Amino acid sequence: MAFPYLKNRLAVLILGAGIGWMGSCSPAPTLPDPLMAGWNGKPVCECLHEDEQLRVLRCTFPPGGGHDRHFHAAHYGYVIEGGRMQITDKNGVRIVDVPSGSSFNNDGVEWHEVVNIGDTTSVYLIVEPKGN
């Protein structure tokens, strides 16, 4: 071949284009955090406090209301008003009776969706530390 360097450059261009194409055909999904996620286009959570160290959200779920698919960073939760919630995540669907006054914490949630399938409004406080 008269121009061997051209063959190498062409191979790099084709390979590079192929890699870029593959990435654009299957982009990683970006999910909202709990504050940005809503239900039927309306907010579910409100920010009560935010500073350099933490953020505190109050999330309210009337009967039949829910929270569209979202992720959570590490957080602590406190249940002000409990209820019966249907939770969908990568493990499937489960129904949980959440008592008022209970609490929970975890290192984060890849994704989940929740729906209040009970008869009363459920209210949660979510405390998210920053910088962890």
Residue ranges and their predicted role:
Residues 2-13:
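Bacterial N-terminal signal peptides that target proteins for export
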Residues 21-24:
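C-terminal motif of bacterial Sec signal peptides marking the signal peptidase cleavage site
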Residues 26-37:
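Bacterial Sec signal peptide processing site at the extreme N-terminus
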Residues 38-68, 74-77, 127:
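A short glycine-rich, His/Asp/Glu-containing loop-to-beta-strand
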Residues 64-67, 103-115:
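Histidine-centered metal-chelating micro-motifs
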Residues 72-91:
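Glycine- and acidic-residue-biased ligand/ion/polar-headgroup-sensing regions
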Residues 91-109:
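Short acidic-glycine-tyrosine-enriched beta hairpin
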Residues 109-131:
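Ligand-binding loop in jelly-roll beta-barrel domains
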